[in-house]
Curated annotation (Swiss-Prot):
Interval spanned by the transit peptide: 1-77
Subcellular location: Plastid, Chloroplast; Plastid, Amyloplast
Highest rank taxon of the organism: Eukaryota
SUPFAM superfamilies per the UniProt record, alphabetical: UDP-Glycosyltransferase/glycogen phosphorylase
Swiss-Prot/TrEMBL GO biological process terms: starch biosynthetic process
Protein name: Granule-bound starch synthase 1, chloroplastic/amyloplastic
Species this chain originates from: Solanum tuberosum
Gene Ontology cellular-component terms listed: amyloplast; chloroplast starch grain
Disordered as annotated region, ranges: 585-607
NCBIfam families: glgA
Pathway given in the UniProt record: Glycan biosynthesis; starch biosynthesis
Length: 607
């Protein structure tokens, strides 16, 4: 454990107000190791002065590597790319929200297209399917030298690598979902700067020192010709360390970094005096230097990890086109990084969803399986099962609304509760499922006391119930103040449950008014108060949706929802195009394939 601790990081909320009729425009694009034997080498810090010429060697597929004359900084991969995703969450091993879902779903989709893909995340728990590689490296964290180890498993065509260190395992063990960033919701670990500095350095070592042989197509270390995809502020040091520790010593000269913003409200702002803890040259200080205009836990001049990640990376991406448009539109929407993003530009690509876990035809949590041809017969039966499960009067004719999400201001759960009091007098039932802030949990649990035959609030983490609500509800309410992409609406549409959503971020990109759902308009993102205008938007839109319930038009909307392509296949193609644009000479676009890589060995852990 490092002896120096850092200050708290804070959360900043954007303040978004959208015109839902505005034209959606495409956001512009901007334009160290010692040689090791097997899996048992220890890589010293001073080994950065040496480099290995080891290249990835294929087992079954040819992979010609030729240099393009005059392009020494161009990645040379032959066919496919070497992609390294780095993040603090990767589903299903660790997940608190959309970040874990993306790192769980996008990498297999890219692997299925013929690329070699690795994910790197902390080992928060003793994952039973990940084995110790026996490879250890040393990294400098603050003023101490720390040894980290790597665990590995190979699933769905992806090398899943986990960074093992007490900073992760001893804090979080046993309760990954609730303790990744702090001991409880809203409270962060004091040493998060050090924890994620360690993660970034370990991630830069892994492609070069891990001799992985689980794939039918690739073997050996990934080498130095790689593309790093850094996700959110926790990994923003990757481009900085890449330049200062590696490329300055002639290592990773061809490597590039794409930085993906999943939620700009979380930026990693710390006291300016903490910069020396990062062990970066002074030339990087300007990229971190930041003075905010809001009242924040850390007073005065600060460092901003996300700002540095944006400025030092080769490409900036976010999780939907409309969210990208919001981020560059104003200081409140970009949470004071709008001007930086306008300078660098940002690309939005909508997320996909896990169509294997969320599949009404095979869902293990529902008694009735269905598809688009049988949905109209199945939904009433599933509604009755849901009503019985939560203790509401069983009546397949009454419209039922669901809400699934974190109980916090961003997700609009406080606005929802205020609105329920207004529309509960209509012919409707509602089931609310979520965990989060205690005051919000108490509010939803009071719903069944106030409206015993109309409402049910469940303040627990309950995966089976989430699936039952998604399948059995007629509508899914998504009242987010801001939503970079959102997954609940995708799950709902997959099951023929019509979204009623706020008009923000990815909700604008994925839900079509009157075709696959109902838009309520944009909400005031000031989190300290519930705006009566937003409550009215929910009430009026719910009434509008209920007026359509049971009609032929509603049946058509259900089928429209289920006809949408929601998997990771299309997003993976767009990600592939973007990453190829970073200069992967000799690489080729992938091929059509299933989300599980064809012929890949499944569930193979490193021996």
């Amino acid at each position: 454990m490092a002896s120096i601790t850092a200050s708290h990081h804070f959360v900043s909320r954007s303040q978004t107000s959208l015109d839902t009729k505005s034209t959606l425009s495409q956001i512009g694009l901007r334009n160290h190791t010692l040689t090791h034997n097997g899996l048992r080498a220890v890589n010293k810090l001073d080994g950065l002065q040496s480099r290995t010429n080891t290249k990835v060697t294929p087992k079954m597929a040819s992979r010609t590597e030729t240099k393009r004359p005059g392009c020494s900084a161009t990645i040379v991969c032959g066919k496919g790319m070497n992609l390294i995703f780095v993040g603090t969450e990767v589903g299903p091993w660790s997940k608190t929200g959309g970040l874990g879902d993306v790192l769980g779903g996008l990498p297999p989709a890219l692997a299925a297209r013929g690329h070699r893909v690795m994910t790197i995340s902390p080992r928060y728990d003793q994952y039973k399917d990940a084995w110790d590689t026996s490879v250890a490296v040393e990294v400098k964290v603050g003023d101490s030298i720390e040894i980290v180890r790597f665990f590995h498993c190979y699933k769905r065509g992806v090398d899943r690598v986990f960074v093992d260190h007490p900073m992760f395992l001893e804090k979080v063990w046993g309760k990954t979902g609730s303790k990744i960033y702090g001991p409880k919701a809203g409270l962060d670990y004091l040493d998060n700067e050090l924890r994620f500095s360690l993660l970034c350095q370990a991630a830069l070592e892994a492609p070069k020192v891990l001799n992985l042989n689980s794939s039918n197509y690739f073997s050996g270390p990934y080498g130095e010709d790689v593309l790093f995809i850094a996700n959110d502020w926790h990994t923003a040091l990757i481009p900085c360390y890449l330049k200062s520790m590696y490329q300055s010593r002639g290592i990773y000269l061809n490597a590039k970094v794409a930085f993906c913003i999943h939620n700009i409200a979380y930026q990693g702002r710390f006291s300016f005096s903490d910069f020396p803890l990062l062990n970066l040259p002074d030339e990087f200080r300007g990229s971190f230097d930041f003075i905010d205009g809001y009242e924040k836990p850390v007073k005065g001049r600060k460092i901003n990890w996300m700002k540095a990640g944006i400025l030092e990376s080769h490409r900036v991406v976010t999780v939907s086109p409309y969210y990208a448009q919001e981020l560059v539109s104003a200081v409140d929407k970009g949470v004071e990084l709008d001007s930086v993003l306008r300078k660098t530009c940002i690309t939005g690509i909508v997320n996909g969803m896990d169509t294997q876990e969320w599949n009404p035809a095979t869902d293990k949590y529902t008694d009735v399986k269905y598809d688009i041809t049988t949905v109209m017969d199945a939904k009433p039966l599933l509604k009755e099962a849901l009503q019985a499960a939560v203790g509401l009067p069983v009546d397949k004719k009454i419209p039922l609304i669901g809400f699934i999400g974190r109980l916090e201001e961003q997700k609009g759960s406080d606005i929802l509760v205020a609105a329920i009091h207004k529309f509960i007098g209509l012919d409707v039932q509602i089931v609310v499922l979520g965990t989060g802030k205690k005051e919000f949990e108490q509010e939803i649990e009071q719903l069944e006391v106030l409206y015993p035959n109309k409402a049910k609030g469940v303040a627990k983490f309950n995966v089976p119930l989430a699936h039952m609500i998604t399948a059995g509800a007629d509508f899914m309410l998504v009242p987010s103040r801001f939503e970079p992409c959102g997954l609940i609406q995708l799950h709902a549409m997959r099951y023929g449950t019509v979204p009623i959503c706020a008009s923000t971020g990815g909700l604008v990109d994925t839900v079509k008014e009157g075709y696959t759902g109902f838009h309520m308009g944009a909400f005031n993102v000031e989190c300290d108060v519930v705006d009566p205008a937003d409550v009215l938007k929910i009430v009026t839109t719910v009434a509008r949706a209920l007026a359509v319930y049971g009609t032929l038009a509603f049946a058509e909307m259900i089928k429209n929802c289920m006809s949408e392509e929601l998997s990771w296949k299309e997003p993976a193609k767009k990600w592939e195009t973007l990453l190829l644009g970073l200069g992967a000479s000799g690489s080729e676009p992938g091929v059509e394939g299933e989300e599980i890589a064809p012929l890949a060995k499944e569930n193979v852990a490193t021996p």
